[in-house]
UniProtKB/Swiss-Prot annotation:
It is found in: Plastid, Chloroplast thylakoid membrane. It catalyses: a plastoquinone + NADH + (n+1) H(+)(in) = a plastoquinol + NAD(+) + n H(+)(out); a plastoquinone + NADPH + (n+1) H(+)(in) = a plastoquinol + NADP(+) + n H(+)(out). The lineage of its organism: Eukaryota, Viridiplantae, Streptophyta, Embryophyta, Tracheophyta. This is NAD(P)H-quinone oxidoreductase subunit 6, chloroplastic. It comes from Arabis hirsuta (Hairy rock-cress). NDH shuttles electrons from NAD(P)H:plastoquinone, via FMN and iron-sulfur (Fe-S) centers, to quinones in the photosynthetic chain and possibly in a chloroplast respiratory chain. The immediate electron acceptor for the enzyme in this species is believed to be plastoquinone. Couples the redox reaction to proton translocation, and thus conserves the redox energy in a proton gradient.
Length: 176
């Protein structure tokens, strides 16, 4: 969006704080329904951040796919679960939980150190140069397709593997 600087900065800080509060709500709220609604709030804030970044197609896809389908599916799944078996085991801390938290913390700190050590100056100029060159050549959807099949092929495939693992995990949990 073409907003004046202070308004853009205010909206950015407001949506960022909404993301933080919503993310804490997802993790810390004991009721799974409230956590699912908090996740919906986080996904709407992410969509609004995409609108601020002039990525209207990605914002619409975020709203339709994640908020409209995935979050509603999560809410329905939580509402139909037998809640008595899930609320009794919340206070147990197992070895798997400790290992999982250790791995996640290690990944978080390695990601933060990688982000801080990377020189982003050349990346920003390359992105702007590509945007200027591709602005007149093809439409936005064609640009997204060409970037997914060339520049972002590896992250796209990694996301598909993560989704496959999540699907297998959901099926194994549902079978138990």
């Amino acid at each position: 969006m073409d907003l004046p600087g202070p308004i853009h900065d205010f909206l950015l800080v407001f949506l960022g704080s909404g993301l933080i509060v919503g993310g804490l709500g997802v993790v810390l709220l004991p009721n799974p329904i409230f956590s699912a609604f908090s996740l919906g709030f986080v996904l709407v804030c992410i969509s609004l951040l995409y609108i601020l970044a002039n990525s209207h197609f990605v914002a619409a896809a975020q709203l339709l796919i994640y908020v409209g389908a995935i979050n509603v599916l999560i809410i329905f799944a939580v509402m139909f679960m037998n809640d008595s078996e899930y609320f009794t085991d919340f206070n147990l801390w197992t070895v798997g939980d400790g290992i999982t938290s250790l791995v996640c913390t290690t990944l978080l700190f390695s990601l933060i150190s990688t982000i801080l050590d990377t020189s982003w100056y050349g990346v920003i100029w390359t992105t702007r140069l590509n945007q200027i060159l591709e602005q007149d050549l093809i439409s936005n959807s064609q640009q997204i397709g060409s970037h997914l099949s060339t520049d972002f092929f590896l992250p796209f495939e990694l996301i598909s593997i993560i989704l496959l693992v999540a699907l297998i995990g959901a099926i194994s949990v549902a079978r138990q």
